[in-house]
C-alpha cells in the first residue's frame, strides 16, 4: 500500500522551479533515500509531502497517515532549520513531538515523560534532558530531534539530513535504529 503518491508534482519559489514533474510512490514499508546536490530540491520535496509549500500536480496521502485530524508523520528537520535560541529543554523538544496528537493546550502525562526519557536514553543523551537545547552539541541536537520525530509513533518518518553533525559511531547507530524503526514505519531521508 502506498502512503504517499506524487504525480507530476512541481514546486516553484518566486518563479524558480525547485522541483519539476516529480512522480514518486512511498510504500508503507519503504526505506527511501533521496540524494542530490545542495540546492537540488531534496528539502523542497520533503516540504511538499508535509504540505508546507504549495505545489502543482497530484500529491495524495493515504488515509492510514491520519488519525482524525492528526497526521501520523514524524519529521526531523535539518538542524539549521531549528532555532537554537528558543528557550526549551532537550526533554521539552522531544515532548513537543506529541503536540500533533495532544494539541498545544494539553499537558504531558507521566507516561509521555517516561517515553521521552526512554527515547533520550536509547539515543545516549538522557543526561542532557534538562539542558537548554541551545547548549547541546550538534550531534546531541540531532539525537533529540530524532527522538522528537518518533515519539508519536508515526507511520511515515521523514528525516532531512539526519547524519549532519554526528560522529561516525552515532551515524552507524542511527542507521541501525532506522533499520529497526522501518519494521513498523516507512522512512524517507
What spans do the regions from the language model cover?
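Hydrophobic anchor residue at the start of the ABC signature
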Residues: 146-147, 174
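Conserved ABC ATPase signature
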Residues: 108, 132-136, 140
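Conserved ABC ATPase "signature" region
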Residues: 109-128
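Catalytic Walker B motif of ABC-type/P-loop ATPase nucleotide-binding domains
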Residues: 157-161
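Conserved structural motif at the start of ABC-family nucleotide-binding domains
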Residues: 4, 18-19, 129
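Conserved ABC transporter NBD signature motif
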Residues: 54-73
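Conserved catalytic loops of ABC-family nucleotide-binding domains
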Residues: 177-189
Amino acid at each position: 500500500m502506498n502512503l504517499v503518491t506524487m504525480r507530476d508534482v512541481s514546486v516553484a519559489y518566486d518563479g524558480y522551479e525547485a522541483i519539476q514533474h516529480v512522480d514518486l510512490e512511498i510504500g508503507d514499508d519503504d526505506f527511501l533515500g533521496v540524494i542530490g546536490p545542495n540546492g537540488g530540491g531534496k528539502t523542497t520535496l520533503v516540504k511538499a509531502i508535509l504540505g508546507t509549500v504549495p505545489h502543482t500536480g497530484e500529491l495524495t496521502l493515504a488515509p492510514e497517515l491520519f488519525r482524525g485530524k492528526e497526521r501520523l508523520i514524524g519529521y526531523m528537520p535539518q538542524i539549521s532549520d531549528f532555532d537554537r535560541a528558543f528557550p526549551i529543554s532537550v526533554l521539552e523538544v522531544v515532548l513537543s513531538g506529541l503536540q500533533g496528537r495532544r494539541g498545544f493546550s494539553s499537558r504531558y502525562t507521566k507516561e509521555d515523560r517516561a517515553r521521552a526519557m526512554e527515547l533520550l536514553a536509547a539515543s545516549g543523551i538522557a543526561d542532557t534532558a534538562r539542558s537548554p537545547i541551545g547548549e547541546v552539541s550538534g550531534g546531541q541536537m540531532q539525537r533529540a530531534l530524532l527522538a522528537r520525530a518518533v515519539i508519536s509513533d508515526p507511520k511515515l518518518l521523514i528525516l532531512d539530513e539526519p547524519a549532519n553533525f554526528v560522529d561516525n559511531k552515532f551515524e552507524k547507530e542511527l542507521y541501525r535504529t532506522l533499520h529497526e524503526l522501518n519494521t513498523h514505519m516507512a522512512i524517507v531521508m
